[in-house]
């Protein structure tokens, strides 16, 4: 029938009594096939049992959730894709360090991610209980692991991405195998969530506990004490410290040997190498205290005097030998003389240099211990331990390198402080020089003064002296002696002066002195040589 319908656009035929056949548009061939298949049973009876199914398509605005398969690799790939999408959402959100809640995903227009997490379940939905709002607020307030400072920021978020990937594999393996206790996985997840908390904090804590669970014990050396010290140095004082769960709250454990002098969670001190003679306990204590709260110091806050102080922070009593002697507000009281500034500055430089040498020696010791532990484990059957030890070693090495960076920063601050002190000293020296010049001039002027002894020998009851030595502005009383004469001492510069006596209120001249006339006035002449 197609050849008969092709000429229709050129010459339309007259209307016929028979029904006209209309072809379906070319853009919808599926509908045409459906119509032909539906019309087939009228002519062919043997196609009655054949049914045509149409695939139902989902709405284009909704993303299909990843389907679970029996293959562990496919499930892992699906969860990895979902984790990448969630991580991208976290990176672009206002809280990159907090795992998003269901309400946050729906509010941001990502209901598809919320549905995908609900469908995936397991590790990704641990923080999504019925109290989603409370969990969301808890995860938002915590944000990152409590053992890391809040200023870690983007670094914590970036580091959390790798932990998310590890957690996804761990969660998929837990879902694939049955529970060892015979209970449902949901029940175990609820108990774990109640025990360790929800949100990103609980996830990171569970990952750390799982890593410690699968880590075999370290081989002990010949002497038990030495092996225990090495284990404590590499494991107990690592960057991710062990925790003790007490009612959902985790408190960092302090070793019994008391080698941690700083109360900052991230700034724990390394154990000293007992065989190394170059390490100084005083220097390490100073560095720990500076890391703990005295990083922003001034030059007057560093002293060579030793005192013992007890610090209390978060329930931890830490007794350290303090090199900073001063009140509790952080401002040191200095009692040194100004002449000892140079010696104190040299002492500060020497101590900073010793600290830098100690940090370098500690880093070398840490690396040598790690190499020794790795070599011992390679001989034994501990195949999985090097991975965990590598993380601890890298964290300890990072802490030492950060301490070196902070030490360099302190030295830079001291250099700036020395520059300011030099400028202040220069300014003070200029002021001192100016004052000294004025003092010299005054001393020179005083050295030119001469003492003049003036006497009135005539009888009188009261005699006053006035003259041009002060511009005739004052009248000085002369002292009467036992003989009845009046005298007065004056300090005058060399020169010629005019003087006159006031005897009992009458202006008079001394007949024994020379006279001079000035504008019709006669005065006595006084010459100072």
Swiss-Prot record:
Keywords: Chloroplast, Coiled coil, Plastid, Transit peptide. GO terms for molecular function: amylopectin binding; starch binding. Residues 1-22, 39-77, 166-275 are annotated as: Disordered. It comes from the Eukaryota. It holds the Pfam family AMPK1_CBM. Expressed in leaves, stems and panicles. Expressed at lower levels in roots and developing seeds. Residues 1-71 form a transit peptide. Residues 41-57 have a biased composition (Basic residues). It is found in: Plastid, Chloroplast. One of its GO terms (biological process) is regulation of endosperm development. Its main location: plastid. GO terms for cellular component: chloroplast. Residues 9-18 have a biased composition (Pro residues). Disruption phenotype: Slight reduction in plant height. Reduced size of the endosperm, reduced starch content of the endosperm and floury (opaque) endosperm. SUPFAM superfamilies: E set domains (SSF81296). The keyword Coiled coil applies. InterPro entries: AMPK1_CBM, Ig-like_fold, Ig_E-set. Residues 400-452 form a coiled coil. Interacts with SKIPA. Interacts with ISA1. Contains a C-terminal (448-529) carbohydrate-binding domain (CBM). Involved in compound starch granule formation and starch synthesis in endosperm. May act as a regulatory scaffolding protein and affect starch synthesis and compound starch granule formation through direct interaction with isoamylase 1 (ISA1). Binds starch, amylopectin and amylose through its C-terminal carbohydrate-binding domain (CBM) in vitro. This is Protein FLOURY ENDOSPERM 6, chloroplastic.
């Amino acid at each position: 029938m197609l050849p008969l319908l092709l000429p229709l656009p050129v010459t339309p035929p007259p209307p016929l009594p028979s029904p006209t056949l209309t072809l379906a548009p070319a853009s919808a061939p599926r509908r045409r096939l459906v119509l032909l298949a539906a019309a087939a049973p009228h002519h062919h009876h043997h196609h009655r049992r054949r049914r045509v199914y149409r695939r139902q398509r989902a709405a284009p605005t909704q993303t299909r959730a990843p389907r679970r398969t029996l293959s562990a690799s496919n499930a892992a790939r699906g969860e990895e894709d979902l984790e990448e999408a969630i991580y991208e959402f976290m990176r672009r959100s206002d809280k990159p360090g907090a795992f998003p809640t269901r309400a946050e995903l729906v509010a941001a227009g990502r209901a598809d991610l919320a549905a995908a997490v609900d469908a995936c379940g397991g590790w990704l939905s641990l923080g999504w209980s019925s109290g989603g709002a409370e969990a969301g607020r808890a995860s938002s307030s915590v944000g990152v692991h409590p053992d890391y400072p809040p200023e870690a920021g983007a670094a914590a978020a970036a580091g959390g991405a790798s932990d998310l990937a590890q957690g996804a594999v761990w969660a998929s393996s837990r879902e694939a195998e049955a529970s060892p206790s015979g209970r449902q996985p949901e029940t175990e997840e609820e108990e774990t969530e109640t025990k360790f908390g929800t949100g990103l904090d609980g996830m990171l804590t569970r990952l750390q506990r799982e890593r410690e669970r699968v880590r075999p014990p370290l081989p002990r050396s010949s002497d038990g004490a030495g092996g225990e010290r090495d284990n404590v140095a590499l494991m107990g004082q690592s960057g991710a410290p062990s925790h003790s769960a007490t009612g959902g709250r985790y408190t960092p454990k302090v070793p019994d040997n008391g080698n941690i002098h700083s109360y900052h969670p991230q700034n724990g001190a390394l154990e000293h190498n007992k065989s190394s003679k170059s390490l100084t306990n005083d220097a390490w204590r100073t560095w720990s205290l500076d890391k703990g709260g005295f990083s922003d110091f001034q030059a007057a806050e560093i002293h060579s005097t030793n005192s013992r102080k007890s610090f209390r922070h978060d329930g931890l009593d830490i007794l350290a030998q303090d090199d900073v002697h001063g009140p509790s507000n952080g401002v040191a009281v200095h009692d040194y003389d100004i002449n000892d500034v140079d010696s104190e500055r040299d002492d500060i430089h020497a101590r900073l240099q010793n600290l830098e040498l100690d940090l370098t020696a500690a880093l070398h010791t840490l690396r040598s211990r790690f190499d020794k532990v790795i070599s011992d484990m390679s001989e034994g059957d501990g195949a999985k331990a090097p991975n965990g030890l590598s993380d601890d070693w890298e964290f300890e090495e990072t802490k030492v390198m950060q301490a070196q960076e902070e030490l360099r920063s302190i030295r830079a601050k001291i250099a700036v402080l020395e520059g300011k002190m030099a400028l202040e000293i220069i300014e003070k020296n200029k002021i001192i020089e100016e004052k000294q010049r004025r003092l010299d001039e005054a001393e020179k002027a005083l050295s030119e003064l001469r003492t003049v002894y003036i006497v009135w020998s005539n009888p009188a009851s009261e005699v006053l002296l006035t003259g041009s030595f002060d511009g005739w502005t004052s009248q000085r009383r002369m002292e009467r002696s036992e003989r009845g004469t009046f005298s007065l001492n004056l300090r005058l510069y060399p020169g010629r002066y005019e003087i006159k006596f006031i005897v009992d209120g009458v202006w008079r001249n001394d007949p024994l002195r020379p006279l001079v006339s000035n504008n019709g006035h006669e005065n006595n002449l006084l010459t100072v040589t």
